[in-house]
Amino acid sequence: MASPLTPRVVCIGFMGAGKSTAARSAAAALRTDAIDVDQLIEQRLGKSIERVFAEDGEGTFREAEERVTLELLERPQHRVLALGGGAIGSQAIRDALRDELVLWLDVDLGSAWERCQGSGRPLAQDRESFERRYKQREPIYAALADAIVPSQRSDAIAPVLEAMHGLPPGSKVLWAATASGDYPAYFGSALLSRNFWPPAIGGRRFMVTDGHVARHYPSALEPLAGRVMIMPGEQSKTV
């Protein structure tokens, strides 16, 4: 993860997830420019990605993708990038992303196919291979991500970036989008014992917990305005 003071935001995700939209939203929040790697590759090669696949093959495209992506990641002035959906297939790119702030734009398979079919994308020609790629890539996106953002929130990245400020290394943010409102859910080892509290979230602190968990963290998140104790078990859980 990059330093929260000078973050470089890298948007990853499957085809049709809204990576370019998210990159523009992040760039606006950080007052900088977004770079779409696929568009830059087209400029460098002088032809569309569709033509590169048809005339030169996927291998040529992947070589250019890796070269251009690594070049951008080596330059700190490029603060917001949108990668192609398959860029994470490169081990070199995955290694380079370890030091960046990675946002995974998570789109469900049905929505991705609906957005991509008939668009001319070379890897969205048939549903079977499309679904196979989706299933292959999903665990890689999840492993690389510092934040997981639903694709329907790709145009509202500023609050996600605020929620990640000060996040301890190795932790993740899942951005929950609900009918009643959006909020960050935090995952990470020993977050409670570190007394982590997002600086972007003000106001009074309340803890909602069950009896089994509460006894292990009697003073977590102090000072608290109050505690709400619920019965342990699945019957007490809601989304």
For every predicted segment, state its role:
Residues 170-239:
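ATP/NTP phosphate-donor binding region
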Residues 36-96:
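ATP-dependent small-molecule kinase phosphotransfer cores
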Residues 14-17:
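P-loop (Walker A) phosphate-binding loop of NTP-binding proteins
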Residues 11:
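Hydrophobic anchor at the beta1->P-loop junction of P-loop NTPases
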